[in-house]
Design a protein with these regions (language model features):
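ATP/NTP phosphate-donor binding region
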Residues: 1-106, 153-202
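Short glycine-rich anion-binding loops that position phosphate/pyrophosphate groups of nucleotides
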Residues: 9-10, 114-115, 137
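Residues at secondary-structure transition points
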Residues: 18, 118-119
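Glycine-rich beta-strand-to-loop/alpha-helix junction loops that act as flexible
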Residues: 68-69, 110-114
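Alpha-helix N-cap/helix-start and coil->helix boundary motif
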Residues: 73-74, 114-117
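Short, acidic/small-residue loops that bind anionic groups at enzyme active sites
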Residues: 107, 111, 120, 124-148
């Protein structure tokens, strides 16, 4: 199975600083002393996934990890992976779409928040590639997030072995227009396919 791994290195930076999200405020957050959140959480997830695969040692179920080198991928992968090149200069939905189009993964594992989820779903377009979110942002209302990084690893492995089926889930995010008026309102921005698990998924 081809597992694409992407980390939004700016996700979650504003959490401890009281920001309502990190979109457009990453530099400000880092200047104020914010530390990486999404990357270390992805590493926790992949550490657990490696632990699971090593304990089972199944030859019939293997995982090939595809990732960019650098902070959006390779820096957080505790083992071998297939490099798809350096992290692009423009790390937006368009670069993510090109990543998906070029490598056609069977499952897309990402670390970030609701804003990251929206970018990925936009990048997927009409593709039915399933996604699993490692919780690493400030806002995580979407149903494609696992409850913890280690839960995300369990979901990935259970999907690889065929123990989980796919289901549609809602992609949610803060309505920025309403938020500018001082109101907190979360609304639906689309749908995504994700492995269904009441135990490990939100």
């Amino acid at each position: 199975m081809r597992l694409a791994v992407v980390v939004n290195p700016d996700a979650g930076l504003g959490g401890r600083l009281g920001f309502k999200g990190s979109d457009g405020r990453a530099a400000e957050a880092r200047a104020a002393g914010a530390e990486d959140r999404a990357g270390p959480r992805m590493k926790q997830c992949l550490d657990k996934l490696i632990e699971i695969t090593n304990s089972i040692k199944s030859e019939s179920e293997s995982i090939e990890i595809l990732a960019w080198d650098g902070r959006m991928g390779g820096d957080w992968i505790p083992g071998e992976y297939t490099s798809t090149g350096q992290t692009p200069a423009q790390t937006d939905a368009n670069s993510t779409a090109e990543f998906i189009k070029s490598h056609q993964p069977d499952l897309f594992l990402y670390a970030g928040g609701d804003g990251t989820t929206r970018d990925i779903v936009e990048a997927l377009g009409n593709r039915d590639t399933p996604i699993v979110g490692v919780p690493g942002g400030v806002k995580m209302h979407s149903g494609c997030f696992a409850t913890t990084p280690k839960s995300a690893a369990e979901v990935v492995w259970s999907y690889v072995t065929g123990d989980l089926m796919l289901a549609r889930t809602e992609v949610m995010d803060l309505d920025e227009d309403v938020y500018q008026k001082g109101e907190w309102k979360v609304r639906m921005y689309g749908e995504a396919f994700t492995p269904a698990s009441p135990r490990w998924m939100q």
